[in-house]
From Swiss-Prot:
Residues 1-23 form the signal peptide. Belongs to the DEFL family. It comes from the Eukaryota. It is found in: Secreted. This is Putative defensin-like protein 238. GO terms for cellular component: extracellular region. Keywords: Antimicrobial, Disulfide bond, Fungicide, Plant defense, Secreted, Signal. Its main location: secreted. It comes from Arabidopsis thaliana.
Length: 87
């Protein structure tokens, strides 16, 4: 009886430990990215929304702007995410 109790307790703790993993990002809908001339500037999000000319239907949840280095110095890369799942 004692071994069955320990086994059940062990299974419960393993379930909790495996389902409480931090650092995993759940997919948040559609993602689109594109390279553009120029730098991100002080407000990269507005720059990316303007550059990508996103329609209002896209409902941008977040845009990330990253200045590029190396061969593409003087360019920036925009990645925008929508809040719509299943695109």
């Amino acid at each position: 009886m004692r071994s069955i109790t320990w086994f059940i307790v062990f299974c419960v703790f393993m379930f909790i430990a495996l389902n409480h993993v931090k650092g995993q990002v759940k997919p948040t809908g559609c993602q689109g990215g594109q390279r553009y001339r120029g730098k991100c500037g002080t407000n990269g999000t507005k720059t990316c929304v303007k550059d990508m000319m996103l329609p209002k239907l896209f409902k941008t949840k977040r845009c990330d702007c990253q200045d590029m280095l190396g061969t593409f110095k003087g360019w920036h890369f925009c990645t925008c995410y929508s809040g719509r799942p299943g695109c």
